[in-house]
Regions:
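Structured nucleic-acid-interacting core domains from mobile-element enzymes and related host factors
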Residues: 209-215
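Conserved "HGTGT" condensation-loop signature of ketosynthase/thiolase-family condensing enzymes
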Residues: 1-207, 221-222, 226-227, 236-374
Length: 374
């Protein structure tokens, strides 16, 4: 499902009073009062016509007009109050949607030696392996050496980070939990990792009220001896922390990870509308739009949305495909793509929009910013 933002309807007020019509009604009632005082009451002077014809007609008109005008004023006040509350609610949801996680360390091992830099050049130079699952560039590895490399690179990005390291989350496809990887992680960081098969623990960090310490998220999409090689080998590691804690500890933030928006089946257009309205992303200034998953369907959906919503896509390469270089996505495509986007944002100093859509038309949208909003 998409973000649980309520659809608040517009409140309609009563139509504005047509004063010219009420003046016509007043003249008609005054005329009727005069005629009735002359014919029915047989008034013979102006005072009787005024007292028994004009004055009652005017008072009746005044009562009716006052009642209608009061209802109109109440309706207008109710609409103003409704609009103010609606705007306040929208502002609160925008703040909720724009919450970020600070990334202070990011490591990516992929089939390409240069990582995301290979995908950022001219299109003719971008590696093309859309149907092939490839091994890591350094295919001769073991978990101990990988964890040692991750630790070394994270230490270079944020010296002495281990003093603030609080937890380690391991994201791995269901049925692929490996004791050897957990043992290697424990030996490297002296922390028992928590293992998950989804990004749920990452999602929960956005709404955490605690100023937690550093969290290391390691995502493993590697080949075992007996597993089918359906997706390329990619391994990532990220140091995640709340923006408040990052500012408090003067951490070197390299990117901001905005709240991830799940996609609803068949609701791509409405999801994009909600995303751009609440996430703070300026669609016209986005230079890097990345797609993964069902790329053909996603490309068609984006083109249709752009044509119908006056979205000027980047001229040179309006879309960048992760799968074009790294092949069919695996179960961990989303968290691995987030690490790729952080690396891309760090290399380009530009925001990155990730659109991940599965053949079932589920998936996620996420904006990765090259700096924090605050």
């Amino acid at each position: 499902m998409a973000w649980p933002i309520p659809d608040i309807p517009e409140k309609q007020s009563l139509p504005r009073l047509k004063l010219w019509l009420w003046m016509v009604v007043l003249l008609f009632m005054l005329s009727a009062g005069v005629l009735s005082s002359l014919w029915m009451l047989k008034a013979t002077d102006y005072i009787n016509v005024l007292l028994y014809g004009v004055l009652p007609a005017f008072l009746i008109w005044l009562c009716v007009f006052g009642t209608v005008f009061n209802r109109y004023e109440q309706s207008t006040a109710a609409k103003l109050s409704w609009d103010a509350e609606k705007e306040q609610t929208k502002t609160e949801w925008q703040h909720w949607s724009r919450r970020q996680l600070a990334v202070v360390g990011n490591v990516l091992f992929s089939p390409e030696e240069k990582g995301m830099e290979a995908l950022l050049g001219d299109f003719k130079d971008v590696p093309a392996y859309p149907k092939k699952a490839r091994s890591l560039f350094d295919s001769l590895h073991n978990y101990s050496s990988l964890m040692s490399k991750i630790d070394l690179q994270l230490e270079q990005q944020y010296p002495h980070y281990r003093y603030l390291l609080n937890s380690i989350y391991v994201l791995q496809a269901s049925g692929r939990f490996d004791k050897k990887s957990n043992e290697a992680i424990f030996q490297q960081w002296d922390l028992v990792p928590e293992t998950f098969n989804s990004i749920e623990p990452l999602q929960s960090l956005y709404d955490s009220n605690d100023k937690y310490g550093l969290i290391l998220i390691i995502c493993l999409q590697d080949w075992s001896l007996f597993s089918p090689k359906q997706a390329s080998e990619i391994i990532s590691a990220q140091l995640i922390v709340s923006p408040d804690y990052a500012h408090q500890q003067a951490m070197p933030v390299i990117a901001g990870l905005n709240r991830i928006m799940p996609l609803e089946p068949g609701g791509f257009t409405s999801d994009l509308n909600m995303f751009f309205e609440y996430s703070g992303a300026d669609k016209d200034s986005l230079e890097y739009i990345w797609i993964s998953g069902n790329t053909e369907k996603t490309t068609t959906d984006i083109m249709q949305y752009a044509n119908g919503n006056q979205w000027s896509l980047p001229e040179n390469r309006f879309l960048h495909s992760i799968d074009f270089s790294f092949g069919p996505p695996g179960e961990m495509a989303l968290p691995l793509s987030l690490a790729m986007m952080v690396e891309a944002a760090n290399k380009t100093d530009r925001d990155q929009l990730l659109i991940y859509q599965t053949p079932q038309q589920t998936g996620a949208l996420c904006l990765i910013t090259w700096e924090l909003y605050i």
